[in-house]
Each structure stands twice: as structure tokens, then as C-alpha cells.
Amino acid sequence: EMATVNGLPLLSETERNPMLTTTYGTGELILHAIEQGYREFVIGIGGSATNDAGVGMLQALGARFLDKDGAVLGKGGEILHRIAAINFSSVHPALKDTRFTIACDVRNPFCGPEGAAYVFARQKGADDAMIEKLDAGMQSFARLIHSTTGREITHVPGAGAAGGLGGAFLAFLNAELKPGIDLLLQTLKFSEKIKGADLIITGEGRTDRQSLMGKVPSGILEEAKRQGIPVIVVAGSIEDTEILNQAGFQGLFSIIPSPMSLETAMKPEVAKKNICRTVAQIISLVNL
């Protein structure tokens, strides 16, 4: 799970800066596992604090990224627009025998208006200028990937996940991207477990139009629709309610009862109390 080493919750708001954050730690985890003899990986790539297109991960695995003068570049999203060549001569030899399945909750392309930078970088600490620079870097890197590997990842669904990490897995590690929610629901035999249900209540920290791009609520809604079961969402914050209602959600409820800081709202005891109170009110309404 890449978020355990490169996740957004690991940084305070003042530390978040996708120009500097890197997926190097994810590469270190993979390298360690390879050296222990593992050759098959299922990796979850949600919730990252990064927008480096997976460059850091590849650096940890031995790849070197060079500028137009042949100098080795550093780390972070800020180097993307400067990458002119990639040297793979020092990558771990076992990678050629390694299989990667990537659990990916979003379907965003690598770059562009719906890509990694424009959709996700702001919550990772980017301002408007950073977002423009990151997307330009992603576009430049995508062109280099195409000229180097022959693979076109610019518009591939999921390539923009985790700040472009999905694209790196596709382009360089022959990975298979699968919706994380599909893997989860399949493992849980969800379709069988909800048979005969009158109502499904699901939730996440923040629900908005992004929730329709392969995240947990959308996966649950899709299966529930097939069985004619209404779905209600509870979340810490909710936006784009009209779009979400049109998608099929029966109702959307914020669990926050009064103004409070994000830090307070995320405390386990506070969140538990707020969730319980909100769900109790929903059930009371259903029982009318």
C-alpha cells in the first residue's frame, strides 16, 4: 500500500508540496520485497501526497533521469519538465520476472484537464502555478515515455492515479491496472452479501464528483443498481450533490453537526460519534 510511505496523511498541511514529494519510498518497499524473493505484487496506489509520475519509485529501483546536458536529476514533481532521457542500465534485474497488479480507485488520465495535476494536486498542496507546471511536466514526460517505450499513456484511464504513479507502472513495469473497488468487492463477495438488502449506507471522508471516478461509493452504487437497492452516502464533507444524485445516490449526508476544524473532525472518537448519530437519524427516517 503506497500510502503507508507516500500518503497524504503522513504530512501536515504546511509540509504538503507536490513539487518536492516523491514516490521513492514505494520503490524502496518494492526493492526490499524483490530482494526477499517476491515476484508477484498487488499494490494499492490511492491517497498519495505525490505528483512525480512515479519517477521516485523508478529511481529507487535503479533508474536514472537525465536532463538535456546528461546530468542526473533529483526527485519530486519539479523535475518532470526537465527530464530529457532515462537510463535503465542499473535497474534490478529481477524486475523483468516480476508481475504487478495495481489496485487503482480512480480512472483519471495521466495529464490534461482531468489528469493527475489538475484534479488532485491542489489537495496535495499545489497552487495554480504549481498545477500548471506539474501538468506541463507530465505532458513532457508522457511524450518522452512514448518516444522511449512506444507506449502512449496520456489518456489511459488510471494512469493519473497517485500523481501519475499508475502511468509509471503501466509504461515501465508492464503492470495491470484494476479498479481497487473491483478487487475489494470481488474478495468480499459483495454481490452475494447484499442480496435482499433494503438499503446500503456507504461513505468516505469527502464525497464529490471525484467519487464517481472509480472510488468505493461508485463501485457500491454500481452493484446496488443491478439489484435495485438504494444507496445513501455519509461523509465528512459533501460537494456536487446534484451530480451525485443524478448518478443514482438516494441521499447524501454530512456527519459534521457544527463548525469544527478538520483536525478535530478526524479524531477517531469524534468521527465515530458523528457517524453513529448521522446513521441513527437516517434509520429513523427510513422507519417512518
Describe each region flagged by the PLM.
Residues E1-I45, A49-L288:
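N-terminal loops that bind phosphate or other acidic moieties
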